[in-house]
Curated annotation (Swiss-Prot):
Species, as recorded: Gossypium hirsutum (Upland cotton)
UniProt-recorded name of the protein: Catalase isozyme 1
E.C. designation(s): 1.11.1.6
Membrane-crossing residue ranges in chain numbering: none
Disulfide pattern: none
Amino acid sequence: MDPYKHRPSSAFNSPFWTTNSGAPVWNNNSSLTVGPRGQYLLEDYHLVEKLANFDRERIPERVVHARGASAKGFFEVTHDISHLTCADFLRAPGVQTPVIVRFSTVIHERGSPETLRDPRGFAVKFYTREGNFDLVGNNFPVFFIRDGMKFPDMVHALKPNPKSHIQENWRILDFFSHHPESLHMFTFLFDDLGVPQDYRHMEGSGVNTYTLINKAGKAHYVKFHWKPTCGVKCLLEDEAIKVGGANHSHATQDLYDSIAAGNYPEWKLFIQTIDPDHEDKFDFDPLDVTKTWPEDILPLQPVGRLVLNKNIDNFFAENEQLAFCPAIVVPGIYYSDDKLLQTRIFSYSDTQRHRLGPNYLQLPANAPKCAHHNNHHEGFMNFMHRDEEINYFPSRYDPVRHAEMFPIPPAVCTGRREKCIIEKENNFKQPGERYRSWAADRQERFICRWVDALSDPRVTHEIRSIWISYWSQADKSVGQKLASLLNVRPSI
């Protein structure tokens, strides 16, 4: 039996209709009433159960990444990186690990069109022999902010107006006018890449900086990158309107239909690494999530391939109840002091416990496929069968022991307790370089999108001036074009 299908279930066992408790139901068409036109009777347990279950079908929507689609497959190592990490699932070329992947839009609600200009989530759960590894990323390699303290406010600004429930540019531009570090992210979001054609033709990135550790304990900072073998394709404005108007679930359907037809999506995994001893050699902070690592200095290194060859069996069980958390790592892969990553480590598991309950890791899509043992038990919706008598540690009656120690990055923590910004902000260099790397027509489309956003009637002269000033510092020509088209002088 498919491990995702847990008994008892009327969908797989009984040839006739039953209640949740297994009692036979001889009539699932009519309610129990006093005569053919009389009152309903509360003793109609099947009716009460049926309605009560229906009333509770919806669970809290994800606060971000609500709109998503999932698929299953495998990850296969193609290149040896055992000199960089002792992670078991990366131990040698040819090793395969089962995975489940969830793609998503970020800001908009469950059921919203998949053609909106929005970052896309790209989250991969590896079911390894040493536990699960969640690589929770996006399609863009950078992010809007570098400190998780700002995350709730950022999401509130990007979400619809709480009064009208309409997403509005003036709110977005007001918030980010206080955060010039967001410019680099906007060179992706307002670029042609802002609306992927579908999930199959989309890159992925781990976004945050992690740490690889080898058997000797040597650590390297690492960035993860997914490259689709079928290439990157995007939708321009008129194309997005046409596609979204015809099918608001076009990306979900494309993913499902492609896998069903045997046209399996595939991505190559690459990494970039930095020796922590060399992190001060750059004009940016390698742990700053608003920066990319230059590929001419830190080249992409091939690692493996991701193939999605099986559609999910049930959307609710394997998409809505599927839960990711950047804190879930395996020996050989660890966190870094990336400020945004440090806050994500707490926030993701916290929101899953709110959304799915304290035992969300027991759900089939989230549970490890390897043996596991601890004393975390009971609580709401605990359905793991346990018959042991020892639920404490240590005990002379239970032979369970500590696992063998694995290397983690050595760290000496010194410094004052303070709330501060990083030293190397350098907010404007990389956005300017990225803009200048584009062809003229691509630059023009980028400018037009900014003019459209800044033309919101509720965007004040002050906010327009600030944005023109920011873009002037990134690339003088961008500021000049925006100032001319908007008839605004930059405020520096």
